[in-house]
């Protein structure tokens, strides 16, 4: 018999799953639609497609974990599911980092020669460097997940409490998030500085005029700021989700922490859609056509 609190958490988890499914699915459809319309992949479309695809997978992994954990608490497959979960989560962070670098390249308005050189050369170089780092981290994560899953046993001279070892396990699996998070923060900081300098120029030269570039700055910063907040909640809830599964497992705690984690892939997709007029209009058309088709084919 489920308690009322656990039933409410399950309802919230399902709602978050449906929001993420619709939001990220709409972004994936929009990206493919743009490709079919133009027969050319732009950097922005590729980033949005990768980001939405990772979030789509992340939503499924969270709901699978919540569904399977009560039934298969000691199964080896849950170990593999957790490793894949970490990889998809880190890939999502990488694509968000690519998005922040893309915004920084397209929107910032510094006039210094060093920055102009960096803007022209370092964008592609940073993407290749981040991609290489991601591949290395993928291999390390798989190795850690497969060989460092059980705490020391027997007569080992070094012994960890099970909960402490689980925190160490979470720390090692998430170690690949640090570099992309630093790049993300640097890019976002450059956007903030660029907005500040641009705002000072506009106050002097064109008071009262409509400032399109400032609006682009603010839209990008809203998206990146919401992502950072949701990602920090996700990162802070992750270790508690792991330790709540230790013996004896606390199912209510698992649902609390993973429901908080599920807000990251579901809500940020809506923020992306609402912040980009083209995507918002396209997604509205897609959803309207889906509803109309459902009414036509429904009973």
UniProtKB/Swiss-Prot annotation:
**Per UniProt, which keywords does this protein have?**
G-protein coupled receptor, Glycoprotein, Membrane, Receptor, Sensory transduction, Taste, Transducer, Transmembrane, Transmembrane helix
Task: Return the similarity comment.
Answer: Belongs to the G-protein coupled receptor T2R family.
| Organism this protein belongs to | Homo sapiens
The identity of this protein, by name, is Taste receptor type 2 member 5
Function description? Receptor that may play a role in the perception of bitterness and is gustducin-linked. May play a role in sensing the chemical composition of the gastrointestinal content. The activity of this receptor may stimulate alpha gustducin, mediate PLC-beta-2 activation and lead to the gating of TRPM5.
Q: Name one GO biological process term.
A: detection of chemical stimulus involved in sensory perception of bitter taste
Extracellular compartment residues = 1, 67-82, 149-175, 245-253
Q: What does the entry state regarding organ or tissue expression?
A: Expressed in subsets of taste receptor cells of the tongue and palate epithelium and exclusively in gustducin-positive cells.
Task: Supply the Pfam families for this chain.
Answer: TAS2R
For this protein, the record's InterPro entries field holds: TAS2R
Q: Which Gene3D superfamilies match?
A: Rhodopsin 7-helix transmembrane proteins
Which residues does the annotation flag as glycosylated? Answer: 155
Other comment = Most taste cells may be activated by a limited number of bitter compounds; individual taste cells can discriminate among bitter stimuli.
A molecular function GO annotation:
bitter taste receptor activity
